[in-house]
Structures are given as C-alpha cells and as structure tokens.
C-alpha cells in the first residue's frame, strides 16, 4: 500500500485564480464503477493552508493516504469512460493503458501539487537542470513502482481482465532524447525526486524525436517517430504558463540609454509539465517541456481570407518546427538557424520561468543579489550555453541592473557539465549567423570576450608576448577575431629601419656607389634593383597566386560556458583529468578552483529494481533488506556470498529467465531465433567510429572465419556459443556510421543463415534501440562491450547498468570503465587495448608510416573483400582503416592497432565462460562493485559541491 498526501490537484503557477475558500463541483462517483450517481467533491483553498481531500480517489487516514486494488480499478474504469481518448465500445489494451496511466497521474498530482506548495512556502534554493535531451523511457511501471503500487495495479487490472505487463507494453517511449546525455538527465531527475532535493528539469517537447530507425537491406532508414500520435497521458499543458521568445530584429539604444531589442520574429513557448515521482517518498518534481507557437494576433487573417493560405500560416509553421525534431540536420544554413533557435528557446523560456518564480517568491521587494542564493542552473553540455548571455540580457535590459551586477549574478548562478572531448562536439556557432539571429546576445558575448581578454592580460602580463598571444587565441570566446584595439598596440612590433645617406659613398664589390636602397639589410644597386623587379614581374605572370582563405569568425560555446559559470565538471575521473590537462588546460591554469569531477551514475530503481525483479529479489534475500535500492553501498555485502553455491544457482536461474524473455523479443523484433543457453554478448549505444562497433564486428568476422576453417568438433571445442547483439542509431547525416550499421546487418544475414555454424554464433541488430529495449537486454547480458578508443569516451552509463545487472565488461581504460574496473576487481573485467596517454604517439607513428598491421587483421579485411557477406566490397568502410593519413583514412580510431589484443582478450572470455562457477562469481562481484555508480551518489555530490542545495522532506 502506498502513502500519498491529501492535497488536491490545482493550477500551479497562477495563484490569483483562487478567490473562494470553497468550491463545490459535481463529479461522477468512481467508487461505484461506471454508475453515474452524482455526488459532491469538496475542495478547500490551499491559500488557507488547510488540508484537502479527493474523496473519490483516496481514503484519508491519520498516517497518510492508502490506495487499494478496488479503488484503483474504479479509477481506471472512470478514466476509460470519462477521459475519452478512444472509442467507448471496447476496453482493449491501448485504451486500458491510457486509462491506467491517467489513474496513476491522479495519484501523482496529489503529491506533485503538495511538493510545489511546500517549495513555495519554504522558498528554499532550487536547482534547475537544462538539457536538450531527456531519454525517459516508459513511465507507467516506473511511476507505480516508485509509488509502491505495483501489486495493487496488477490486481486492479486483473479484475478488469488485463495483465499489467501487457498494458504497460502499449506505452511508447517518450522521444525526447537519443543517447547518454538524455538518459543521464532522466536518471538525475529520478534521484533528485527520490532524495527530496528541490529541483526541476527543463527541456523541449519534440513532436517527432530524433527518428524511428528501420533496418532494411540497404541499412538504416530514418522515419518520423510520432510518439504523440495517440496523446500523452502523463503531460499537463499549462495554458497560463507561456513566455515570448524573439529572433532576428535589431538592437537600438533608447533615450534612457538602455538597449532595446526590437522587431524580428516573435513566438510563444508554452509549458507542458510531466511529473517525476521519487521512490518511497511523497516528493514529486517537474520536468517542464516547452512547445512553440505564435500568438493568435500574429495569424495573418487578411492573407488567409485572400486565399493566400500558405502565407497566412507561415509564421505558425516557423514557430512549430522549432520543436519538431531533436537535432535537425545542420548542413544547411536553415538547419543551423533551426538548431540555434531550439537552443535559445530552451534557454530563454526556462530563464523567464525561473525568474518569474523567483520574483513571485520574493514578494513585493525583489533583492536580485539573492538570486544565486535561490537559484542554481546546470547546463547539461553546451546546448544551453545561451543561458549565460540571456540571463545577463534579462537582468540588464529588463530588470535594470548594471553590467557588474548582472555578470556577478550570472557567474554565481550557472554551472556547466562537459560531456565530450571530441573537438566536433565542442560547439561553435557562426558569428555572422548568431549576429543575425540574436543581435543583442552577440553584443553581450563581445563584452564577455573583451572582459576575458583583459583578465588574461592582467594575469600573465606582457613580458612574454608569444605566450600571451597563444593564450588569447586559445581561450577567447570569439575565434578568428582581431585583438581589440585597446591592447593591440602590445603586439605591434617596431619596424627595423636604417638610414642611408644617398650622398654617402658605399663600396660594393669593389665599386663605389653613390645611390643605393636598403633591402632586408643588404645594399642593392639601382641596376640590381631593376633586375629583381623584372624577375618579380615574370614570376607574377607565371603564377596565379591563390589568396589564403579567411577563416570564418566563430563563437566558441564551450569557452563561454567555462568563462560564464562558477563550476565546470567532467563525468568520470579520467575524463575530468583530460578536461583539465588538455581540453581546457589554459582555463584550468587560470581558474583551477572551477574544475571538478562528478562521475556519472544510473538510477538503481529503473535499472535493476524494476527492470530485473528476479535478480532484485535474490539480492534482497541474501543481503536481508531492500534498503540497497536507496543505499547501493549495501550491494557490496554480496561479496561475501560470491562463492556460495546456492546463491550461484539462483543467480544463474535469474539470468537464464531473462535470456528466455530476450530470445522471444528478438524473434518478434528481428525474426531470428537464438538459444538462451548461449552467452549474450551485447554492444548497445549510439553508432560512432570512436565507440568502435567496427572493431566488434571485425572481431566477429575473424571468429566466423576461424569457425569456417575448422571441423564441427574443433569449433565446439574452441568456441562457446554466442549471440552477438548490437543496437543503436547512427545520425542520419553520419555516413560512415551508417556504413558500419549496414555492415553489421550484412554480416548477421550471412552468419545467421549458415547451417554449419547454427547456434554457435548469431549476430543480431536490434532496430530502433531505446530505453524499453535496454530494460530487456541488459538483465539478460553475459558480456557487454565498451571498447571506445581510449581517451575519447567521457564516461558512459550503459557500462554501469550492465555491471549493476551482473554483466561482465570487456573494454579499454576509458571513461567510467577505469573506475568500474577498480570497484569490481581487475580480475573481473576483461581489459585490452592502448591507453589514453599512448594514443597521440600511436597516431603520429601511423602518420609517419611506422605502423605494421597484425597479420590476422589483414586476413579479416581480405576475407571481407572476397564477397563473403554479399556483393558489397565495403571499400569506403575498410578504406578508413588503411593508409597513413588523410580524411577518412589512417585508422584514426586505432581499430587495427587494438585488434590483436581485442581478439586475444575474447579468447580469455571464452575460457572463463566455460567454467560457470568462475563466471557466476565474476558476475556477482560486478553487481557488488557497482554500488558506486548510482546516480544518487552523483546527485548528492552535485548538490553539495556545485548547487549548494539541501534535501527538503515533507513534514
């Protein structure tokens, strides 16, 4: 039974609408099933600070509110009839899901509003997490699990003729994210709510997400993912919460001396709220998503009535498309503008909302100097960077603060999480484009840049001008810009001149010359000068000099993040070291106090407690408590049972039951049958060259090649049966990644139909991999591959999820792999490959032609070129592994270098898997060692070290 507060849902932002202390509303009686007997719902105004009840949903008791299966069934039946989203004739699964979700939402709203009211009353400091992605997954099972109502909802649905698991399967994954960035954000929200921290998330409400992935004979195909087609029962549109967002226009200085941004294109950002419940707590926080439209007065009614319908709707179409797609293609100028509009919409609407809340809570007298004491803004990567100039703009232009005041407030409020060391992912925007789209923000960025220049000059002085110039070139926010005139004179070198008296006689080659000219410290006669000029003229005729290209002026968003915030954190120890020593080394030398590490984590609720109930029950049984779900350090207690035969038997049984489920899932999704007795070897993540799915599939090809050269008896003696599972999306415009996906499916099509190989080796590509697929695959995994080129993966989170579920990792010393290996034990992690500090030297050796490829690597490439996997020769794909340098050449990601150690490490995997006692022991120790990688630990660190917020527990 679950404890809920007794607070009635109501409007959350506009409190002025509550004028009457009592309202009486006639509603259907849900407890009577679908009978339409009327009765009165009593709602007392929250402004009286009196408790309220929803009598038809819950029963009030002294210790809290309890929901049982009967009242839940009545609630579901009520929504099936009175919250119509489907035809009334039948109560089929889609309708059952929608009604069940709305029933759960009723329960969430009770706590949601109570949380909001309590935050308003206490006016404590609150954290705001801004992210372009939130990869939530399905909400139903997670919500009822956090409410501790899983059993009650299962029983209620059984009464109504349905199974909870089947009903939950009808929920589409929310298409609000793509990869680790969005999944981390969602894990953080779960931990924030569970740990009772006052916080909100802010994002965009994408209509079509990134894309829905289909796998055809031609490889990956992208189609729109209309996850909102049947509506979203979890969201509540806040029609009274909208903010204007402006693009283009111009900046003028008014008679009052203030800057005014006028003209241009105006849209409205409208709030959609999604409740995020904590586990075993009443705290329910908000994820506020922005959708975009134009104000109704901007609709061109005249053009519409004149028959120019497209023109009349143009403004609305331009506004709506901002929230159509996550990461729209940006090869075109239009695509770049759309992406920048997305980022600015997120920043502007969110900050306006945060400021409105701060002003409302402050009352009549707003003390802006207290803003950083009430607000912490965390930028999840560089996408929300425009928070910095936008906050300054609002404070100066709209609130009347000085530059000094606005800059001080902004720096104390904003913090930045870096998620990548890849140069292409450290965002840069065209200065020309930004100046056109956001003219006021460019002015502010220029002021920040000039302020930074002055600070650098002040810090390092002018004794070493070469060093100073390099610092400025590397650290400035504005790239490829001239140095401001205020300090340009520091770098002006005096010209060397010599005075020659034309009447003075000079002896040159034994001759006396009276007229001479000075040329580069050598005296040249007039005749020699004429001769040189003739030669220069001839050279000019022979050559058509090509002027050096002028590099484009850019705005470095990552540099702006570092300069404009008070904290910069990496997401794993090795990543944070690279950030300090390489990516932002100049900034680290200037402001070492800004830089921190916050190793990522994942929520143990979704990623083991709910997705792997069989293993969770075993853990609880052997530890003797379920407290590990909130305190994962207790997982370490499993270490003392790692060799216990009874535990090992139960552990293997749980793993096999999960594999049976996955085998059924793969058959349904791909058509391929796999054996649950095989090892499930899984690599699921975004398709990218640095993540090296190519290394994995080349290793599989080598394995297959060996098998084909052996007899059946030799094959079975050397290899353990494996099901190699891939999943992940390649960005639509990332050609090489799409080639890798195509190659994987081609290899699978050949191997999976080879009767000689049978169940000894299968290769499966799971189309449209998402959170729901992960919740099935991860509990069933035996081996998981995290094999990025060392030094290129910031952290990763899937490695943590796999380890938490007793999966053994094979990987490089990269990202969080380093810390996972430390915690689970070196002997329980399969390590291979070059280390991060070796990478630069290895690339240099390759460029110099010193790399000698392993014979086995060359054999694999030749095997592929023979057409074993179809008529495609894969020239472009294999070509990237050949040559010594050049775009798309030279094996930049060191697949060839690491290939020998990789396949040798895979042989060790086979050897370990043969002894199931050893393998199960390793599996148990991986779960035991995963305790550090809970997002609860990460959030505690953010709250203490960056946000300075405290948990707020309901009285």
From Swiss-Prot:
Cofactor: pyridoxal 5'-phosphate
Gene3D superfamilies xref list: Glycogen Phosphorylase B
Domain of life (superkingdom): Eukaryota
Reaction catalysed by this enzyme: [(1->4)-alpha-D-glucosyl](n) + phosphate = [(1->4)-alpha-D-glucosyl](n-1) + alpha-D-glucose 1-phosphate
An annotated GO BP: glycogen catabolic process
Family annotation (InterPro entries): Glycg_phsphrylas (IPR011833), Glyco_trans_35 (IPR000811), Pyridoxal_P_attach_site (IPR035090)
Region (Disordered): 522-550
Biased composition (Acidic residues): 528-545
Organelle transit peptide: 1-43
GO cellular component, one term: chloroplast
Keywords per UniProt: Allosteric enzyme, Amyloplast, Carbohydrate metabolism, Chloroplast, Glycosyltransferase, Plastid, Pyridoxal phosphate, Transferase, Transit peptide
Enzyme class: transferase
Subcellular location: Plastid, Chloroplast; Plastid, Amyloplast
GO molecular function list: glycogen phosphorylase activity; pyridoxal phosphate binding
EC number: 2.4.1.1
Positions of modified residues (N6-(pyridoxal phosphate)lysine): 801
Function: Phosphorylase is an important allosteric enzyme in carbohydrate metabolism. Enzymes from different sources differ in their regulatory mechanisms and in their natural substrates. However, all known phosphorylases share catalytic and structural properties.
Record family assignment: Belongs to the glycogen phosphorylase family.
Name this protein carries in UniProt: Alpha-1,4 glucan phosphorylase L isozyme, chloroplastic/amyloplastic
Organism lineage string: Eukaryota, Viridiplantae, Streptophyta, Embryophyta, Tracheophyta
């Amino acid at each position: 039974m679950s404890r809920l507060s007794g607070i009635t849902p109501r409007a959350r932002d506009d409190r002025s609408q509550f004028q009457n202390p009592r309202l009486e509303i006639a509603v259907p009686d849900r407890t009577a099933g679908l009978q339409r007997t009327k009765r009165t719902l009593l709602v007392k105004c929250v402004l009286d600070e009196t408790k309220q009840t929803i009598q038809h949903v819950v029963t009030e008791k002294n210790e809290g509110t309890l929901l049982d299966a009967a009242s839940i069934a009545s609630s579901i039946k009520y929504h099936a009839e009175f919250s119509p989203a489907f035809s009334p004739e039948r109560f089929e699964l889609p309708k059952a899901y929608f009604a069940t979700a709305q029933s759960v939402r009723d329960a969430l709203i009770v706590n949601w509003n109570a949380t909001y009211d309590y935050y308003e009353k206490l006016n404590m400091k609150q954290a705001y997490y801004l992210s372009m992605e939130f990869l939530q997954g399905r909400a139903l099972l997670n919500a009822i699990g956090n409410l501790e109502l899983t059993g009650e909802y299962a029983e209620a649905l059984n009464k109504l003729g349905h199974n909870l698991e089947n009903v939950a399967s009808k929920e589409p994954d929310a298409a609000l994210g793509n990869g680790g960035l969005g999944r981390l954000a969602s894990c953080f929200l779960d931990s924030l709510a569970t740990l009772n921290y006052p916080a909100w998330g802010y994002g965009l409400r994408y209509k079509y997400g990134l894309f829905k992935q289909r796998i055809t004979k031609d490889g990956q195909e992208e189609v729109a993912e209309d996850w909102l087609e049947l509506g979203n029962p979890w969201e509540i549109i806040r029609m009274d919460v909208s903010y204007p967002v402006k693009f283009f226009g111009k900046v003028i200085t008014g008679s009052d001396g203030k800057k005014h941004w006028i003209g241009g294109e105006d849209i409205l950002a409208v709030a959609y709220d999604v409740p995020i419940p904590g586990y075993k707590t009443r705290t329910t926080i908000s994820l506020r998503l922005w959708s975009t439209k134009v104000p109704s007065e901007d609709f061109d009614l005249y053009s519409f009535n004149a028959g120019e319908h497209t023109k009349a709707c143009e403004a609305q179409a331009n506004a709506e498309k901002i929230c159509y797609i996550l990461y729209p293609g940006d090869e075109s100028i239009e695509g770049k503008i759309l992406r920048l509009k997305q980022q600015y919409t997120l920043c502007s609407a969110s900050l306006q909302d945060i400021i409105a809340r701060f002003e409302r809570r402050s009352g009549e007298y707003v003390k802006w100097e207290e803003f950083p004491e009430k607000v912490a803004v965390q930028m999840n990567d560089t996408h929300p960077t425009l928070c910095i100039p936008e906050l300054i703009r609002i404070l100066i232009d709209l609130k009347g603060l000085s530059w000094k005041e606005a800059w001080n407030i902004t720096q104390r409020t904003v913090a930045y999480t870096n998620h990548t060391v890849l140069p292409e992912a450290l965002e840069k925007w065209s200065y020309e484009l930004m100046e056109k789209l956001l003219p006021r923000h460019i002015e502010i960025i220029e002021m920040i840049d000039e302020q930074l220049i002055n600070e650098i000059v002040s810090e390092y002085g002018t004794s070493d001008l070469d060093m100073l110039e390099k610092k400025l070139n590397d650290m400035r926010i504005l790239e490829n810009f001239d140095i401001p005139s205020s300090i340009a004179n520091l770098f002006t070198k005096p010209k060397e001149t010599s005075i020659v008296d034309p009447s003075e006689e000079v002896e040159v080659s034994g001759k006396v010359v009276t007229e001479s000219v000075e040329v580069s410290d050598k005296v040249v006669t007039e005749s020699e000068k004429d001769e040189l000029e003739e030669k220069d003229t001839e050279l000019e005729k022979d050559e058509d000099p090509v002027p050096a290209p002028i590099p484009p002026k850019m705005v470095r968003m990552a540099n702006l993040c570092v300069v404009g915030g008070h904290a910069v954190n990496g997401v794993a120890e090795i990543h944070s070291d690279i950030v300090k020593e390489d990516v932002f080394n100049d900034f680290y030398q200037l402001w070492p106090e800004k830089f921190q590490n916050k190793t990522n984590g994942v929520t143990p609720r979704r990623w083991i407690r709910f997705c792997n109930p069989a293993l969770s029950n075993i853990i609880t049984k052997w530890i003797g408590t379920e407290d590990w779900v909130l305190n994962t350090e207790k997982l370490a207690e499993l270490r003392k049972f790692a060799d216990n035969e009874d535990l090992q038997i139960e552990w293997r049984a749980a793993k096999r039951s999960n594999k049976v489920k996955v085998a059924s899932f793969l058959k349904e999704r791909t058509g391929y049958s796999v054996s649950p007795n095989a090892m499930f070897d899984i690599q699921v993540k975004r398709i990218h060259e640095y993540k090296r799915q190519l290394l994995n599939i080349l290793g599989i090809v080598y394995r297959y090649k060996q098998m084909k050269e052996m007899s059946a008896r030799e094959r079975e003696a050397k290899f353990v049966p494996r099901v190699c599972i891939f999943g992940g999306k390649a960005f639509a415009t990332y050609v090489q990644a799409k080639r890798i996906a195509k190659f994987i499916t081609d290899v699978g099509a050949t191997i999976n139909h080879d009767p000689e190989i049978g169940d000894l080796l299968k290769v499966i590509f799971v189309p449209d991999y998402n959170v729901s697929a992960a919740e099935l695959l991860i509990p069933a995994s035996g081996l998981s591959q995290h094999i990025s080129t060392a030094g290129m993966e910031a952290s990763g989170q899937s490695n943590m999820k796999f380890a938490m579920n007793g999966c053994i990792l094979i990987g490089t010393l990269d990202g969080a792999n380093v810390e996972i290996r430390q915690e689970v034990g070196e002997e329980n992690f399969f390590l291979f490959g070059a280390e991060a500090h070796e990478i630069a030297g290895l690339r240099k050796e390759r460029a110099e032609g010193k790399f000698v490829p392993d014979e086995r690597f060359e054999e694999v490439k030749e095997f592929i070129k023979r057409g074993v996997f179809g008529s495609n020769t894969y020239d472009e794909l294999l070509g990237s592994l050949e040559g010594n340098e050049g775009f798309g050449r030279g094996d930049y990601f060191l697949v060839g270098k690491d290939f020998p150690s990789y396949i040798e490490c895979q042989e060790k995997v086979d050897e370990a898997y043969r002894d199931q006692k050893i393998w199960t022991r390793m599996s148990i120790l991986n779960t035991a060692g995963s305790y550090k990688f809970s997002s609860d630990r990460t959030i505690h660190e953010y709250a203490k070290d960056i946000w300075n917020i405290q948990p707020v527990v309901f009285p």
